[in-house]
Structure formats: C-alpha cells, structure tokens
A protein has these predicted regions:
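Short hydrophobic alpha-helical segments that form membrane-spanning helices or hydrophobic packing faces
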Residues: 101-107
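An N-terminal alpha-helical hairpin/helix-loop-helix interaction module that forms a charged
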Residues: 1-95, 111-202
Length: 202
C-alpha cells in the first residue's frame, strides 16, 4: 500500500471543502471574509488582537490584508524572504510573533512556492533533522524540500492512481498533510496531542 494513500484522500476532501474555495474568495471575492475564515479555521485569530485593527477604526484584519498584498508572486521575491518579511510586518502591527500564520496567509495569497511552517510538521521533520530548531524558517524550508524531493515520485503516483490533482501545489500540500499526520502521532505518543496541520500549534 502506498503510504500516501490516506494523505491524498484526506487532503483531496479538505482542499475541495476549504483551501480552494477560500483561496478563490480571498483573491476574487470578499477578501475580509476570507482572511477571517482562514484565521479562524487555522486558529491564529488570537495572535491578532482587535485593538490593533478595529480598535483604531479599521476593518477586522485590514492591516493583515494590506501587508499580504505587499507581497505578490509576480514581483519575483524569494518566497522564504516574503514569509519572513511578512512575519516582521505583522509583528510590528500586532505585537506578536506570527511565523506560522504568515506562512499560511501567504500560501493562500500565492497558492504555490510558499512552504507552510507548522510545529507538528516540524516534529516530523526533526526525526530526520534533529538539530533543526523551532522558528528557523530557512532551515525548516531546506529540510522540507529535501524530504519532499525524496517522496515526490510516490506522492505523484498515488495522486495519479486516485485521479487526484496532478499540480505541484497539491502534491506539496499532500506532503504537508503527511508531515502533520506523523507529527500528530508523535504528539499523541508523548501525551501532547495538538490540532492538525490546518490548525496546528503556533
């Protein structure tokens, strides 16, 4: 049995239910509603105090949206630098460290190239890269890419077998889902279970 079978099945359903329609809404519909749904579903809303947007007369998450639109993929900015710059911008605006949230927000804005930072996935990656420290986004991305390259062919084969999406962004998110699932299993074994990758620990 292909070890990515469950991940492809589960992410296919999740992408259809949330990622794809919400990303479309962010880019082509009510962006405020979309960013609110992302923040709520991914449980990052608590990092963005209302006193820094509604409290100063702005719409909820308006500073987040303004910051996100400053980093567009067509500007050819390095995606890692874009995530780190957005993290700094949002920390300045909301007085919180929000690396995980920034990577998630920017993934929805770009839809590709952005590697989502998540602590459950980090736990999985650390089994191969034990010296990797939390919040080291450069190191996280480097390790993530190494592991993805090893498994990309198997993921593609399983997506083909299931007649799932064959685009690279989808394969990358299947791999994210796989890392989260392994990390969650490790957390449960240690008695420290947390939410899934889509709502992972910050």
């Amino acid at each position: 049995m292909n070890r990515f079978r469950e991940d492809v099945e589960e992410y296919t359903r999740f992408a259809a239910k949330f990622d794809t329609p919400v990303r479309y809404e962010l880019l082509h519909g009510n962006s405020h509603e979309a960013i609110s749904r992302i923040a709520g579903f991914y449980r990052v809303a608590r990092s963005f105090s209302r006193k820094f947007d509604e409290g100063i007369g702005l719409a909820r998450y308006e500073p987040v949206l303004s910051a996100i639109w400053s980093y567009q993929p067509e500007r050819s900015q390095d995606p890692i630098e874009a995530v780190l710059d957005l993290t700094r911008d949002l920390k300045r605006l909301y007085r919180k460290e929000v690396l995980s949230a920034s990577s998630k927000f920017l993934w929805f804005a770009w839809g590709r190239e952005i590697i989502i930072y998540d602590s459950q996935a980090l736990a999985s990656i650390q089994t191969r890269f034990p010296s990797l420290k939390p919040k080291n986004y450069y190191g996280y991305c480097s390790a993530w890419r190494t592991l993805f390259a090893e498994d990309m062919g198997e993921i593609e084969s399983e997506c083909l077998r299931q007649a799932a999406c064959m685009e690279r962004w989808f394969h990358e998110r299947v791999f994210d889902w796989h890392l989260w699932r392994l990390g969650k299993r490790q957390s449960r074994a240690s008695g420290n279970a947390d939410s899934p990758l889509v709502i992972g620990k910050r």
